[in-house]
């Protein structure tokens, strides 16, 4: 199990560094060619004013992420937060609404805007790549979800055949283990989708030279990280990960956006968000992230919980969960005005 935890650490760490390096390299290599003058920044930028918001955002966003992801994990201390309680179902519905709105209202529109920018003059981009990439990402997420669960189930069935047929309770144990594994796969894939988006939006804040834009992103990101942390923390709690795995996953979620902000600040002077290479790289990453988040929220979070026997047998819980879902999606959609 320790080896798996180490592999998990290196996996998420490598993904984070790779994404940061790709975006950074894209900006560095885009200065040799002609530049597109599609800048959205005000000509009279106050870099000093923007910098104070960036510096303040690093610890604030970090703390907001920690609070969000740890809240559902406190079930061991507070019984009302345990996965089997009604409060947990309602909280998870709210978080699923947040993640769904993140995919539809934040990430997908950004990807569409980037991949349909007038700065991209190539005829190849007349094809609707945004939806295509999001669709492929959703299909790949489905494949990872089903193949990982199927692989574990087959291997476990082979082992269980060696046990005497006279033993009872084996079927229920197998089913429980498969469900736990599937929840773990869901948590890891969901974190990957969130990390991709977090790196991109963190770099956007760090590279922003406008105080107004930096302030708006700063405020929006606080709630953004906290709300997304609720959804991820809920999946981690249901996956029954060991303490080290919980620490690793929670830490990577919390630090990814602050790392993106720091990288953005480092490349702010050379960053050209309207360069074709940067638009393509960030557009593709955002589209893929949107596909992952939309699939995970609808299939693995909402569908799983809303068809759960506990939910189906409790009309009051269903109503509360739907209200929480609409509230989470509504609040996150409102944040799209600023970020």
From Swiss-Prot:
Ranges of the Extracellular topological domain: 26-54, 108-123, 206-216, 269-278, 337-339
Membrane topology: Multi-pass membrane protein
Main location: membrane
Cleavable signal peptide: 1-25
Keyword Secreted: no
Location within or outside the cell: Cell membrane
TM spans (from-to): 55-75, 87-107, 124-144, 185-205, 217-237, 248-268, 279-299, 316-336
Induction or repression: By zinc starvation.
Annotated Gene Ontology cellular component terms: plasma membrane
Residue intervals on the Cytoplasmic side: 76-86, 145-184, 238-247, 300-315
Keywords, in A-Z order: Cell membrane, Ion transport, Membrane, Signal, Transmembrane, Transmembrane helix, Transport, Zinc, Zinc transport
Tissue-by-tissue expression: Expressed predominantly in the roots of zinc-deficient plants.
One function term, GO molecular function aspect: zinc ion transmembrane transporter activity
Function: Mediates zinc uptake from the rhizosphere. May also transport other divalent cations.
PANTHER family found in the cross-reference section: ZINC TRANSPORTER 3 (PTHR11040:SF141), ZINC/IRON TRANSPORTER (PTHR11040)
Additional remark text: Zinc uptake is inhibited by copper, cobalt, cadmium, iron and manganese ions.
Name of this chain's protein: Zinc transporter 3
Species per Swiss-Prot/TrEMBL record: Arabidopsis thaliana (Mouse-ear cress)
Lineage: Eukaryota, Viridiplantae, Streptophyta, Embryophyta, Tracheophyta
């Amino acid at each position: 199990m320790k080896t798996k935890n180490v592999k998990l650490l290196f996996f998420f760490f490598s993904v984070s560094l790779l994404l940061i390096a790709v975006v950074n390299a894209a900006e560095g290599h885009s200065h040799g060619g002609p530049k597109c003058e599609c800048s959205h920044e005000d000509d009279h930028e106050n870099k000093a004013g923007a910098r104070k918001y960036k510096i303040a955002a690093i610890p604030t966003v970090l703390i907001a992420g920690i609070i969000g992801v740890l809240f559902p994990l406190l079930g061991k201390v507070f019984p009302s937060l345990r996965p089997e309680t009604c409060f947990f179902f309602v909280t998870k519905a709210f978080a699923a609404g947040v993640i769904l709105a993140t995919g539809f209202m934040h990430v997908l529109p950004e990807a569409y805007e980037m991949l349909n920018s007038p700065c991209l003059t190539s005829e190849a981009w007349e094809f609707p790549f945004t939806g295509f990439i999001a669709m492929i990402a959703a299909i790949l997420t489905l494949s990872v979800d089903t193949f990982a669960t199927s692989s574990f189930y087959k291997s476990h069935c082979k082992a269980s055949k060696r046990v005497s047929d006279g033993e009872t309770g084996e079927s229920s144990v197998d089913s429980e283990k498969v469900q736990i594994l599937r929840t773990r796969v869901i948590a890891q894939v969901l974190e990957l989708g969130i990390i991709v988006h977090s790196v991109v939006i963190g770099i956007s804040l760090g590279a922003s030279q406008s105080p107004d834009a930096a302030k708006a992103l700063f405020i929006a990101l606080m709630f953004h990280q906290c709300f997304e942390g609720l959804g991820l923390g809920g999946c981690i709690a249901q996956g029954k990960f060991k303490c080290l795995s919980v620490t690793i996953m929670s830490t990577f979620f919390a630090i990814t956006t602050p790392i993106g902000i720091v990288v953005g600040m480092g490349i702010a002077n050379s960053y050209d968000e309207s360069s074709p290479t940067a638009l393509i790289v960030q557009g593709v990453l955002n589209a893929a992230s949107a596909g992952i988040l939309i699939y995970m929220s609808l299939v693995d979070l909402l569908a799983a919980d809303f068809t759960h026997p506990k939910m189906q047998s409790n009309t009051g819980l269903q109503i509360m969960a739907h209200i929480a879902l609409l509230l989470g999606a509504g609040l996150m959609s409102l944040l799209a005005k600023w970020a």
